[in-house]
């Protein structure tokens, strides 16, 4: 009798929550960066949400500083939002709140991107996801090339690191960059041109910088 092997179905990859970080004050820009027009159409907000949807489908949320901030960035009612539990504690607070939400709702981790990176691509995010699936208990971060620099707000954080991120929030420096440089993580190289962030009108060029 010939034994036949039955192929077992592949296990579904653990679910990721896509988190758009849009809680900054945009003080140097003078207007919410989420509302800036994107070169490919729409706004920085709509472009960033569409980019995340192509990776995480509808499993996305927007991290904001407060309920009042939701109206300021004109977030559509259909898009869920998370709010910082304490004000003015920087992006580490948004990361911590998102990880707590992900853990409570059955997600394995969060894919974070800021709203002010207009040139980041879907392929860049997929490269992070691919690296994370190889080692889903590790933090995966974008590593800017030329010059090299870690980008702690572009990456995947597993819910297992929730407590360590909360300790960053409670620390004196509250710096993800400082903490992650000395912690265990893996990196994915992404060209610096695609990690260009926009902080002032001059970063946008004409006609926004009045030159």
Swiss-Prot record:
EC number: 2.7.7.77
MF (Gene Ontology): GTP binding; metal ion binding; molybdenum cofactor guanylyltransferase activity; nucleotidyltransferase activity
GO terms under biological process: Mo-molybdopterin cofactor biosynthetic process
Entry-linked InterPro entries: MobA-like_NTP_Trfase (IPR025877), Molybde_CF_guanTrfase (IPR013482), Nucleotide-diphossugar_trans (IPR029044)
Gene Ontology CC terms: cytoplasm
Range of residues in the leader sequence: none
Required co-factors: Mg(2+)
Protein residues bound to GTP: 21-23, 33, 84, 116
Binding residues annotated for Mg(2+), in chain numbering: 116
CDD domains: MobA (cd02503)
SUPFAM superfamilies tied to this protein: Nucleotide-diphospho-sugar transferases (SSF53448)
Reactions the enzyme catalyzes: Mo-molybdopterin + GTP + H(+) = Mo-molybdopterin guanine dinucleotide + diphosphate
Entry keyword set: Cytoplasm, GTP-binding, Magnesium, Metal-binding, Molybdenum cofactor biosynthesis, Nucleotide-binding, Transferase
Protein's cellular compartments: Cytoplasm
Functional summary from the UniProt entry: Transfers a GMP moiety from GTP to Mo-molybdopterin (Mo-MPT) cofactor (Moco or molybdenum cofactor) to form Mo-molybdopterin guanine dinucleotide (Mo-MGD) cofactor.
Family: Belongs to the MobA family.
Free-text comment about domains: The N-terminal domain determines nucleotide recognition and specific binding, while the C-terminal domain determines the specific binding to the target protein.
Protein name, per record: Probable molybdenum cofactor guanylyltransferase
Organism: Rhodopirellula baltica (strain DSM 10527 / NCIMB 13988 / SH1)
